[in-house]
């Protein structure tokens, strides 16, 4: 069993915002797999399929970013998903725009959605795919993450989403995480 969790904020108000990179990536993967993420369960929108004989969950928590842990924990408990079967997709202000970074574990690094998942699960031992949204120059962080990408930045973001979905597909198809890091970091 594998679960891919895209972090973001629900609702049209936040659609396309920098903080919703996780949602955008999971939506792209769902499209590749001909899935619709529309089942509401455990404070999350989900889709399930089977790939290579394994059950796959695509998840978009509907609790707002800073409370994502509850949905992740409840899905883990109900479906008996282990931490090493989870891959969380997030935005990262400390990475240059469009850069991907994969990590096996680690601290939240200031990301409140990750912090809440660590708190809810009691562990930081889950895989992450971080996508750079760049740090704001003079703008307040909260305003920066909740605004959409500029038209000039959008092609770079579209490319990053494609690469992120390539990485997730490779993981779903059994590529070892160390190889994923070598290929996509």
UniProtKB/Swiss-Prot annotation:
Residues holding tRNA: 14, 64, 66, 112
Site feature location: Stabilizes the basic form of H active site to accept a proton: 91
Keyword NADP: no
GO molecular function: peptidyl-tRNA hydrolase activity; tRNA binding
Catalytic reaction(s) noted: an N-acyl-L-alpha-aminoacyl-tRNA + H2O = an N-acyl-L-amino acid + a tRNA + H(+)
Enzyme Commission designation: 3.1.1.29
Residues under site feature: Discriminates between blocked and unblocked aminoacyl-tRNA: 9
Pfam families per the UniProt record, alphabetical: Pept_tRNA_hydro (PF01195)
Signal peptide: none
SUPFAM superfamilies assigned to the protein according to its UniProt record, in alphabetical order: Peptidyl-tRNA hydrolase-like (SSF53178)
GO biological process: protein quality control for misfolded or incompletely synthesized proteins; rescue of stalled ribosome
UniProt subcellular location: Cytoplasm
Function: Hydrolyzes ribosome-free peptidyl-tRNAs (with 1 or more amino acids incorporated), which drop off the ribosome during protein synthesis, or as a result of ribosome stalling. Catalyzes the release of premature peptidyl moieties from peptidyl-tRNA molecules trapped in stalled 50S ribosomal subunits, and thus maintains levels of free tRNAs and 50S ribosomes.
Protein known as: Peptidyl-tRNA hydrolase
Biological source species: Lacticaseibacillus casei (strain BL23) (Lactobacillus casei)
